[in-house]
Amino acid sequence: SIAIPPLGCGNGGLNWDLVKKMIIEALENTEAEIYIFEPNTDIKQALQTKSAGKDIKLTPSRGLITYAMYYYDSLGEDCSLFVANKLAYFLQRQGSQAFAKIKFQAHHYGPYSHQIDHLVYDLNGSYIKGFEQMNATAFEPLTMQHERRDEISKYVRTLDQQEQNSLKATIDLISGFESTLALEVLA
């Protein structure tokens, strides 16, 4: 027997209906029992509820990226892994020591780092929702928990001046570029 997961339909962002059809067509003449496991949104929703309210220790990188994401989200644009990567890249370019060691690589949509995925995952359940199981496409919206925004603002004010300046410079830089395409071009 063969068990097949929903290939490419998590982080890959592929349409499950098309993928399932391709799998069935490719394996229809196979003389084995085949089990195809479909994506399950109920699991993701249950995990969102379960992880809500967890507390994490704030660090400069967590505080800065969360503040920048709150700012971006408050402009009416959805935050996503794509947005988080671009904001982190800009923070690094603006001199933030908290992001100095992050290694960005050229990717489909500009600079990208898997380290940012882990940073966003750490924030999930406390400051954002939508990244349970580290499973979201680049542009899948992440829900910001705005009721904790004041906490982040207070934390950022405790950071050294260089970090605060890099955050201000990043916010100034993205002003007028509040869309995913504009962020990509800017990066």
Language-model segment annotations:
Residues G10-L14, K44-Q45:
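Short catalytic/ligand-binding loop motif for oxyanion handling, primarily in non-cytosolic enzymes
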Residues P6-G8, M69:
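Short, histidine-centered active-site or binding-site loop motifs used for metal coordination
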Residues L18-L27:
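A glycine- and small-aliphatic-rich helix-loop capping segment at beta-alpha/alpha-beta transitions
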Residues N29-E33, P39-A187:
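Domain-edge interaction signal
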Residues G8-G12, Q161-E163:
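Short linear motifs at secondary-structure transitions and domain/linker junctions
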Residues S1, P6, L14-D17, T30-I34:
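Catalytic phosphate/metal-binding cores of nucleic-acid and nucleotide-processing enzymes, i.e., regions
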Residues G10, A26-N29:
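Mid-sequence acidic-hydrophobic segments that form the walls
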